[in-house]
Amino acid sequence: MNTEATHDQNEAQTTGVRLRNAREQLGLSQQAVAERLCLKVSTVRDIEEDKAPSDLASTFLRGYIRSYARLVHVPEEELLPGLEKQAPLRAAKVAPMQNFSLGKRRKKRDGWLMSFTWLVLFVVVGLTGAWWWQNHKAQQEEITTMADQSTAELNADKDSGQGVQLDTRAAASQDTTPAETAPAAPVDSTAAATQNTVVAPSQANVDTAATSATATETSSALPTDQAGVAAPAADSNALVMNFTADCWLEVTDATGKKLFSGMQRKDGNLNLTGQAPYKLKIGAPAAVQIQYQGKPVDLSRFIRTNQVARLTINAEPTSAQ
C-alpha cells in the first residue's frame, strides 16, 4: 500500500522536481552540479524548472538529464516518461536533394569565363591595332608634310637662282659691249700704219711665232692654277651619307642653315659640310648609312621602332642624341 502510494507520488512529480529534491537530499548546490557535469548554472536551472531551451537540441537535453540523474542517484527508468514530455525527439527536416549535375554547372561557368576571356582579348587586339594604325598614319602625314615643305623651298631656291643668273648675264653683256667696240680705233690706226709703213716678211713671221708661243704658254698655265684652286682640303666635320633606298631627309647645322632638304634616291650619296652640331630629320632611317669623322652613326633604335629619326650629331665622333 505504501509502495504504491510512493510510486504514484513519484509519477506526480516532474523530472525537474525529482532531480532538485535528490540534489537537495545530497546537499549539493546548483553550482556544484554544474561544475561536475561541465554545464552552465543556467542549464541546470532550466532542467530543474522543466524548461527546454530553444537553442539546445533535444538530444543534448536528454543526455544532460541522464547525467544529472546518475549524479544524484535517481534511476533513469523512472525519468523516461517525463523525458518524453519534457524533451521529445524532433524529426530532423531533410531538404529534398536538388536534381542537377555539378558537372553541367561547372561547364556552364567555364563557358561564361571563356567567353569573357575571348572578349577581353579581342578588345585588347583591336585597341592595339587602332593605336598602331593611327601612329603609322601620323608618321606618313608628317613625312608628306616635310616633303612638301622641302619641295616648296627647293622651288623658291631655283627661282631665286634663275633671277641671279639673269642679272649676272645682263651685267656681263654690259661689260662686254665696250670691250668689243674699243678695238675699232686701233684697227683703223693699224691700217693707216700699214699703208705708210712696209714691214719685212721675216720680221712679221717672227712676231707671229712669238705671239702664238706666248698664248700657248698662257693657256697651258691656266689649267694648272685652276686645278690647284679646285682641290681644297677635306673637312673633318663633314657628314657622309650613302642611301640604299629612296629616303627623305633634312640636315641643319648649328647656325640654322639648311645644308640639305629633300628626297634622295637609291644608291645616292651626300657629303655635307657645316658647323657642328648637326640636326637631322630622316624619314626612313633604314635606308641611309651615316658617317661622321670617319665613324658610323648608330640609327638602330630608330630602325627598330620604324619611326621618323630626329637626332643631333655632336662634335664628338658618332654621338647622337
Curated annotation (Swiss-Prot):
The lineage of its organism: Bacteria, Pseudomonadati, Pseudomonadota, Gammaproteobacteria, Enterobacterales. Residues 133-321 are periplasmic. Residues 1-111 are cytoplasmic. Cytoskeletal protein that is involved in cell-shape control through regulation of the length of the long axis. Belongs to the RodZ family. InterPro entries: Bact_Cytoskel_RodZ (IPR050400), Cro/C1-type_HTH (IPR001387), Lambda_DNA-bd_dom_sf (IPR010982), RodZ (IPR023690), RodZ-like_C (IPR025194). Residues 19-71 form the HTH cro/C1-type domain. GO terms for biological process: regulation of cell shape. It comes from the Bacteria. HAMAP family: RodZ. It is a single-pass type II membrane protein. It is found in: Cell inner membrane. Keywords: Cell inner membrane, Cell membrane, Cell shape, DNA-binding, Membrane, Signal-anchor, Transmembrane, Transmembrane helix. This is Cytoskeleton protein RodZ. CDD domains: HTH_XRE. Residues 30-49 bind DNA. The chain crosses the membrane at residues 112-132. The gene is rodZ. Gene3D superfamilies: lambda repressor-like DNA-binding domains (1.10.260.40). GO terms for cellular component: plasma membrane. Pfam families: HTH_25, RodZ_C. NCBIfam families: PRK10856.1. Residues 176-190 have a biased composition (Low complexity). PROSITE patterns: HTH_CROC1 (PS50943). The helix-turn-helix (HTH) motif in the cytoplasmic domain of the N-terminus is involved in the formation of spirals to maintain the rigid rod shape. As this protein is anchored in the cytoplasmic membrane, the HTH motif may contribute to protein-protein interactions to form the RodZ helix, which is localized beneath the cytoplasmic membrane. The C-terminal domain may be critical for determination of the rod shape by probably interacting with enzymes required for synthesis of the peptidoglycan layer, including PBPs in the periplasm.
